[in-house]
Curated annotation (Swiss-Prot):
Pfam families: Neur (PF00064). Its main location: virion. Intact N-terminus is essential for virion morphogenesis. Possesses two apical sorting signals, one in the ectodomain, which is likely to be a glycan, and the other in the transmembrane domain. The transmembrane domain also plays a role in lipid raft association. This is Neuraminidase. Residues 328-347 are annotated as: Disordered. It comes from Influenza B virus (strain B/Memphis/3/1989). Residues 35-465 are virion surface.
Length: 465
């Protein structure tokens, strides 16, 4: 037990009553995750008696006190593990975060200009992360907000449900690529920045900057733009380094309490893997649906064994191609590993697991347009193996219509008391080109209830206003 978690209770007994003094040396972050609450609601009065003395004037009253110390050892917060998903058979519209509906606000209430939003959850709260350009709307710093990488970008967060304004946002670190996750005790934040030829991964655990990882291919080292995944105190992060139009081999970093303890080098179909969206299929396996920006419209699919710390990559075999741009579904001939055509370019895709006692559901998102970042549709496949199943995925509803932007999407899970709620988030970009501001809203859909997905999402933002 760490010294910081020791609570010392000193009880002073006096002839006139009781004084309780509680010395708490645990940190606030620890107390937030403790299930123990100390309450003192009853009064204690020391007993008194009447003294009959023959000569009362010679009696001297002496106050004596006794001190008794009791030490309470409170348990550490638990490491998190994946649990069964909460019950449900369909996703519904849960939340829209559309900051620029409040674009008339100025000063600290102005919405930040952001892109690449994602959500990560701990036992008690979820955080909405994004990469900001260190600018707000309205404002005078719109130039450059369409760039992917520059010296001003930062990883920021707000509590999920808050609008990412200047005053609401926490700035975690300088970064033009990011990730974050909670191990059950503390947050791990990941940020990447630096020149394209020598970028650097930085790790922050709680409030401390703890470790770094250097570029290994000297070609835009970057991470997944969605939540990393933790089990038993170990957090797994996908990274890649290489050409956007050629070879870019990924790795996984195993991180514990902010320190890199192992590198994992995947085998298999490793030519190009980036922007993976990952989650737990079980307590043994992390699965990721990723982006190949160079060769194929199929998604590279990773299986990482957390018991052996080994990973393998193969292409998804389904005839429902999930990247954008993409060819017609079912048009790629040959074995599952065939790349097909229209493989140049791509987009990060949403992916989340529905873990059930007797089966597993894998939920995916893809744009409705085959060529543009417009619209977003939800798909599901129960059981089977994504490496070998060639069947089409089942469409499960429209989250964003063809009239609205559908850019990056991602998966995450909200912690309920006894189960985990799978969700998919969608980045809806306001693309003002290079002459004005360029930012995003976030739409969130979660597993809840039964029936059909009922309603799509609009941002409600008119950039001309």
């Amino acid at each position: 037990m760490l010294p910081s978690t020791i609570q010392t209770l000193t009880l002073f007994l006096t002839s006139g009553g009781v004084l309780l003094s509680l010395y708490v040396s645990a940190s606030l972050s620890y107390l937030l995750y403790s299930d123990i609450l100390l309450r003192f609601s009853s009064k204690i009065t020391a007993p008194t008696m009447t003294l009959d003395c023959a000569n009362a004037s010679n009696v001297q009253a002496v106050n004596r006190s006794a001190t008794k110390e009791m030490t309470f050892l409170l348990p550490e917060p638990e490491w998190t593990y994946p649990r069964l998903s909460c019950q449900g058979s369909t996703f519904q519209k849960a939340l829209l975060i559309s900051p620029h509906r409040f674009g008339e606000a100025r000063g600290n209430s102005a919405p930040l200009i952001i892109r690449e939003p994602f959500i990560a959850c701990g036992p008690k709260e979820c955080k909405h992360f994004a990469l900001t350009h260190y600018a707000a709307q309205p404002g005078g710093y719109y130039n450059g907000t369409r760039e992917d990488r520059n010296k001003l970008r930062h990883l920021i967060s707000v509590k999920l449900g808050k609008i990412p304004t200047v005053e609401n946002s926490i700035f975690h670190m300088a970064a033009w690529s990011g990730s974050a996750c909670h191990d059950g005790r503390e947050w791990t934040y990941i940020g990447v920045d630096g020149p394209d030829s020598n970028a650097l991964i930085k790790i922050k655990y709680g409030e401390a900057y703890t470790d770094t990882y250097h570029s290994y291919a000297n070609n835009i080292l970057r991470t997944q733009e969605s939540a990393c995944n933790c089990i038993g105190g170990d957090c797994y992060l996908m990274i890649t380094d290489g050409s956007a139009s050629g070879i870019s081999e990924c790795r996984f970093l195993k991180i514990r309490e902010g320190r890199i303890i192992k590198e994992i080098f995947p085998t298999g179909r490793v030519e190009h893997t980036e922007e993976c969206t990952c989650g737990f299929a079980s307590n043994k396996t992390i699965e990721c649906a990723c982006r190949d920006n160079s060769y194929t419209a199929k998604r590279p699919f990773v299986k990482l064994n957390v018991e052996t710390d080994t990973a393998e990559i193969r292409l998804m075999c389904t005839e429902t191609y999930l990247d954008t741009p993409r060819p017609d579904d079912g048009s790629i001939t040959g074995p599952c590993e065939s790349d097909g055509d229209k493989g140049r370019g791509g987009i990060k895709g949403g992916f989340v697991h529905q873990r059930m006692a007797s089966k597993i559901g894998r939920w995916y998102s893809r744009t409705m347009s085959k060529t543009e970042r417009m619209g977003m549709e939800l798909y599901v496949k129960y059981d089977g193996d994504p490496w070998t199943d060639s069947d089409a995925l089942a469409p499960s509803g429209v989250m964003v219509s063809m009239k609205e932007p559908g850019w990056y999407s991602f998966g995450f899970e909200i912690k309920d008391k006894k189960c985990d709620v799978p969700c998919i988030g969608i980045e809806m970009v306001h693309d003002g080109g290079k002459k004005t501001w360029h930012s995003a809203a976030t739409a969130i859909y979660c597993l809840m209830g039964s029936g059909q997905l009922l309603w799509d999402t609009v941002t409600g933002v008119d950039m001309a206003l």
